[in-house]
Design a protein with these regions (language model features):
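Short, leucine-enriched amphipathic alpha-helices that occur as contiguous helical runs
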Residues: 17, 29-31, 120, 145-146, ...
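C-terminal secondary-structure termini that scaffold catalytic or DNA-interacting sites
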Residues: 59, 72, 78-86, 90-95, ...
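Basic, Lys/Arg- and aromatic-enriched nucleic-acid-binding interface segment
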Residues: 1-50, 58, 109
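N-terminal core-binding DNA-recognition domain of tyrosine site-specific recombinases/integrases
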Residues: 6, 28, 117-121, 137-143
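Catalytic-site neighborhood detector that most strongly recognizes the C-terminal catalytic loop/helix
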Residues: 3, 11, 68, 159, ...
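Active-site/catalytic core of tyrosine-dependent DNA strand-transfer enzymes
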Residues: 11-18, 67, 92-137
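DNA/chromatin major-groove-contacting recognition/catalytic segments
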Residues: 6, 15, 19-23, 73-79, ...
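C-terminal catalytic core of tyrosine-transesterase DNA break-rejoin enzymes
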Residues: 35, 39, 45-46, 126-129, ...
């Protein structure tokens, strides 16, 4: 990702995402797909390749080991984008419950079944529908990944920890998101003020 692309990066905050997602609760598969994308930072191909065997609800872990594409009308499973893309992603309890509820609603799901058995085109259309219904600013589906990374940066996690979670080859890629939170400089100055006053320097 070049500097120009980084500067143009658009994201949703947690509240913006919630408003969007609330408008898609009529389609469970769509709603869950966006929940997973926003709260894990998975790439769209990684999400669509997930099978129930890859999702350990008891251990609260998703294993990423493949990617999905739809080529010439056929489902194609390929290796992940990069070696670092092979990873395990821990998921929060609320997402475990969302996936379990969804799984319980299905008729006899098998381990080899895809969790989200749709295409990227379907999810892109559903995203357009959700943005129209919610009035949210328009972003691309890949921007849900940007939103997750930006959320983690804002929560104070290190670039290394974030890079491992989202499968970046280098922490340099993760650092390119930092410009999204210019107030961090102000926070740093404020904390230095507080530190000086506490120590009576």
């Amino acid at each position: 990702m070049g500097k120009a692309k980084a500067d143009e990066m658009e994201i949703w905050t947690k509240d913006e995402f919630q408003q969007f997602a609330d408008c898609l609760m009529d389609k469970r598969v769509s709603w869950l797909a966006y929940q997973i994308l926003f709260w894990t930072g998975l790439r769209i191909g990684e999400l669509l390749a997930l099978t129930f065997a890859d999702v350990d609800l008891e251990g609260k872990v998703i294993t990423i080991n493949k990617s999905y594409q739809r080529l010439k009308g056929k489902d194609v499973i390929t290796p992940p984008k990069t070696p670092k893309s092979n990873r395990k992603v821990n998921i929060p309890q609320f997402l475990v419950e969302d996936i379990q509820d969804y799984k319980d609603s299905l008729y006899d799901p098998q381990l080899e079944d895809r969790v989200i058995p749709v295409t990227k085109t379907f999810l892109e259309k559903e995203m357009q529908r959700g943005m129209k219904l919610s009035g949210m600013k328009k972003i691309h589906i890949h921007s849900l990944r940007h939103s997750h990374i930006s959320l983690l940066i804002d929560m104070g996690f290190t670039a290394l920890a974030i890079a491992e979670r989202v499968g970046h080859e280098s922490i340099d890629i993760t650092y390119r998101y930092a410009h999204l939170f210019p107030t961090r400089q102000v926070e740093m100055a404020d904390k230095l003020d507080s530190l000086k006053n506490e120590k009576g320097v």
